């Protein structure tokens, strides 16, 4: 029977070939730190009690490996939660801005948008660019970049973020926009 003797570095290489590099680096730093910070008599005491050579180093290695995995998972979870928090905050601020703009629309601006909402169109149709349409473009409610001529009329698309809020706050019975409250 032929025995195969493997170098410890080859064994470690095979173990860590499937591990992410970041986790491996955490593990090495934790392992070396634990070995350096542990008192000198602990390895001797453990070896005497158990009788297996270098069991202390293997134990510390296993501990470092477990800590590295948990640190890696915790940092990934914390990072994902932080990103979700920032996204929710950005969406909330954007919704508040949209609601604020809709709340402060003049009567003429509101009527222009009501005409489009009443007909179910996602754009405003006009024969020329009136001052209140220019104001809606400046507010960002209408998109001038994608406006197009349709015969004698100009079509100004309503921005998507405003469209969803306008549809939610539109009252078709009274043909008016009832702004929803801004969140606090």
From Swiss-Prot:
Disulfide bonds: none
Transmembrane segments annotated in the record for this chain: 23-39, 55-71
InterPro entries linked to this entry: SieB (IPR025982)
UniProt entry keywords in alphabetical sequence: Host membrane, Membrane, Transmembrane, Transmembrane helix
Membrane topology of this protein: Multi-pass membrane protein
GO (cellular component) term, any one: membrane
Top-rank taxon, per record: Viruses
Cellular compartment(s): Host membrane
UniProt-listed Pfam families: SieB
Function: Has a role in the prevention of superinfection by phages that are insensitive to repression.
The protein's name in its UniProt record: Superinfection exclusion protein B
